[in-house]
Amino acid sequence: MNNEQKSIKKELVFSSGKGRVTSSGLIDGSLSFSFKSKKDSAFIQVTDPIGRKVLLIWATSIDLTARNLIQNKQYDSSEIEELLPIMKVVQPNELIKFLWGEKVQYRKKDKSIPLEVRKNIDLRIKSEKGLPYSIMDFYDNLLDQKIKIQIKSRNINKEKIFLKKYWKLLKY
């Protein structure tokens, strides 16, 4: 990366966009989401097919927290991993990178991921329609679960965003 590219990258401070999560297997269905992200954190709002906000997700480089708005339940990282096995192999910082259009690092030989998980997981990242790294396909052979996360639109710009107001939603 040359100095000009580094300078441009430093100026990009905010990313937002929309996408869709499609799942089959343990959980079948499709939900839309929107996101707002800084380089070190992200806020994701998931809506059901009729447009109701159903799940709010906060990601930092090391942690995930989610709130189910229908059941008024809050989940920490370990509970999220049980509900969404994809999060066993995609760390929160990698999820943030994906929202920015950067390649997610998943190493099948990563010893920090249990062998049983590594043997049964297939994760592929693809680009589509001019959007870099906009599709994440996950397949768990053991659970016969497929999850596809697709970014439909992504805006990256120099505007500053303050995610503090979104973090306050955790406290209700």
Language-model-derived ranges and their functions:
Residues 1-36, 166-172:
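N-terminal leader/targeting segments and the immediate start of mature chains
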Residues 9-10, 34, 53-57, 124-129:
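Short linear motifs in intrinsically disordered
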Residues 13-19, 27-35, 40-46, 55-57, ...:
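One face of beta-strands
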Residues 27-29, 51, 119:
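Residues that act as N-cap/strand-start positions at coil-to-secondary-structure junctions
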Residues 36, 60-62, 78-84, 128-131, ...:
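A short, sequence-level motif marking secondary-structure junctions
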Residues 41-93:
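An acidic-aromatic
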Residues 68-71, 112-172:
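Non-transmembrane domains of secretory- and envelope-associated proteins
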Residues 81-122:
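Extended, positively charged loop/linker patches that create polyanion-binding surfaces
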